[in-house]
Every structure is written in C-alpha cells, then in structure tokens.
C-alpha cells in the first residue's frame, strides 16, 4: 500500500490540503507528500500503486482518482484538473502517463 512508500502523516497532510474547493496543484501535492525526496524506486512503487489496472500506464480515469490512490479520504479531481495534469505529464502525447513520464513529473516538481 501507499503507506509502505510514504508515511501516513504526510499522505493525510497532502490529501487535506486539497479538500473540495482547493484547486489541485501537483507540484504542491508532491512536496507535501515528500515524494520528490524519495528514491526513484519509491517513486516507481507509487506509480505502480496508482496504476490500478496494471496496464503500465496511468490513464485519464486513474489520474482523476490520483488522490484516492493515496488515501480513500481523497476527492476525485475535476475534469479540468485531470486534463491539465494529463497534458502536463503526458510528454509523448499518447493520452496516458507511463512510469518514465510520472518519474519526470515528480522530478520537475
């Protein structure tokens, strides 16, 4: 589970920062989680947890549930937040985020 990668207290802090009404900001989310300070192996582990269908990609519907991937308390992203994050992360334009793209997205945060 995600708590094997990131301490639960950090997950809770990050999830609560983006309650309903708070615009989702991936960079801020990554910093609150401390994900940018984790090892590449941990970032890859987080990716695989978010990749619910084990396709090797985070598709748009999985991206919309990214906060829920960290905690069931998390809200769904709005359609606009999801699209914005997809555009930011999808470097090769295939409409989904691969592990290398996810790692880059975290590293750039």
UniProtKB/Swiss-Prot annotation:
UniProt family annotation: Belongs to the parvalbumin family.
Annotated GO MF terms: calcium ion binding
Domain EF-hand positions: 38-73, 77-109
Gene3D superfamilies: EF-hand
Protein's recorded name: Parvalbumin alpha
UniProt xrefs under SUPFAM superfamilies: EF-hand
Organism, scientific name: Amphiuma means (Salamander)
UniProt-annotated binding residues for Ca(2+) 2: 90, 92, 94, 96, 101
Binding-site residues for Ca(2+) 1, renumbered to this chain: 51, 53, 55, 57, 59, 62
Function: In muscle, parvalbumin is thought to be involved in relaxation after contraction. It binds two calcium ions.
GO CC terms in record: cytoplasm
Keywords, sorted A to Z: Calcium, Metal-binding, Muscle protein, Repeat
Cross-referenced SMART domains: EFh
């Amino acid at each position: 589970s995600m708590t094997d990668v990131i301490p639960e207290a950090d997950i809770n802090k990050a999830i609560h920062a983006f309650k309903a009404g708070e615009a989702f900001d991936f960079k801020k989310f990554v910093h609150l989680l401390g994900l940018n300070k984790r090892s590449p192996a941990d970032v890859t582990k987080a990716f695989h947890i978010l990749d619910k269908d084990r396709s090797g990609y985070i598709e748009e519907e999985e991206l919309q549930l990214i906060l829920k991937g960290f905690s069931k308390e998390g809200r769904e992203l709005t359609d606009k937040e999801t699209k914005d994050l997809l555009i930011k992360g999808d470097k090769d334009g295939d409409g989904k985020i691969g592990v290398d793209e996810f790692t880059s997205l975290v590293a750039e945060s």
